[in-house]
Regions:
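Alpha-helical solenoid repeat scaffolds
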Residues: 1-169
Length: 169
């Protein structure tokens, strides 16, 4: 006998398909926001029935990373929210590394950042500080990338150590 897919199974498959589409669109929106293509990011976000509010927040915080000063706006700490905060922190790192550093520890404990995301945020903070020859760059880089997996970070760390004449490190 030919097995026909029941209504419940169809509904389940469709729901799963929509979920995949949402996550696919959400990741495209994140890439667009990272590339500063806010028009594309916004149009993708509008097509996200389940994640549109969080998607809009991601695009907003990418453009106005100061919004991170109010952590209550970024709750609950879902995966989409963690993406928004991560992107915001990387933007903030370039504008105001001190503020980004202060916020990173708090957000790192409440958000679900992947190890790579933490390294990526710390890298932005560290590199911005390193370009200003600020020795705190070393602490940030060492704390979040102790294995020095990131080559750019390793190079800047070395330059900074030489510049600051800290031979023992």
């Amino acid at each position: 006998g030919v097995h026909t897919v029941g209504q419940d199974e169809k509904a389940g498959l469709l729901a799963g398909h929509e979920f995949f589409d949402d996550h696919f669109r959400a990741s495209r929106a994140k890439l667009a926001a990272e590339a500063r293509n806010y028009a594309l990011a916004n149009s993708l976000v509008k097509t996200l029935p389940t994640l549109s509010a969080q998607g809009r927040l991601m695009v907003d915080v990418a453009q106005k990373p100061d919004m991170l000063s109010d952590p209550s706006r970024f709750l609950p700490a879902t995966e989409a929210m963690s993406d928004a905060v991560g992107l915001g922190l990387r933007r903030l790192a370039r504008q105001d590394p001190d503020k980004a550093m202060a916020l990173l520890d708090g957000y790192a404990s409440s958000m679900h950042f992947s190890r790579d995301e933490k390294v990526s945020i710390a890298r932005e903070i560290g590199l911005t500080l390193a370009r200003r020859f600020d020795s705190r760059a070393l602490d940030v880089m060492t704390k979040y990338d102790p294995e020095l997996r990131d080559n750019t970070v390793s190079e800047w760390r070395l330059c900074l150590l030489l510049r600051l004449a800290r031979w023992d490190d």
